[in-house]
């Protein structure tokens, strides 16, 4: 009988996707099937003031990654992915290098549903989507 793979959730804005995201997803895929919880365009606009790439574009890129089983849009009106985690109830919620136990509001949801939390998946913080966009603005590349 084939052993069922663990369901591993990762989350983020992925706007734009960068090498740190690639490494996090690759590391998560070694643990099981990856479900990417991708923040919504309205969430990005509330957090950063803009959406560099649409959810549809980010989703298409993320679905192309090896090991990604699905990409779902976060129900993130409250600023978290708690509602989405409660719905999918993965085995593991894997967090990248910019998330820590003291800045992750999803901890209580994970405890409630017995979702294991992992930190530093894919290594430490390597790059910032916001910094990439700021650098592009500095060299004169404009969005839209």
Protein language model regions, located:
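Nucleotidyltransferase catalytic core that binds NTPs
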Residues: 1-144
């Amino acid at each position: 009988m084939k052993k069922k793979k663990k369901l591993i959730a990762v989350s983020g804005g992925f706007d734009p996707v960068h090498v740190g995201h690639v490494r996090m997803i690759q590391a998560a895929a070694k643990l099981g099937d990856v479900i990417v919880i991708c923040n919504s365009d309205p969430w990005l606009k509330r957090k950063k003031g803009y959406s560099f790439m649409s959810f549809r574009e980010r989703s298409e890129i993320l679905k192309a990654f090896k090991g990604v089983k699905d990409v779902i849009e976060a129900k993130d009106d409250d600023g978290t992915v708690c509602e989405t985690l409660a719905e999918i109830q993965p085995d593991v919620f894997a967090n990248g290098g910019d998330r820590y136990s003291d800045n992750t509001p999803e901890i209580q949801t994970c405890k409630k549903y017995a979702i294991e939390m992992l930190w530093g998946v894919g290594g430490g913080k390597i790059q910032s989507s916001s910094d990439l966009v700021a650098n592009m603005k500095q060299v004169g590349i404009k969005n839209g």
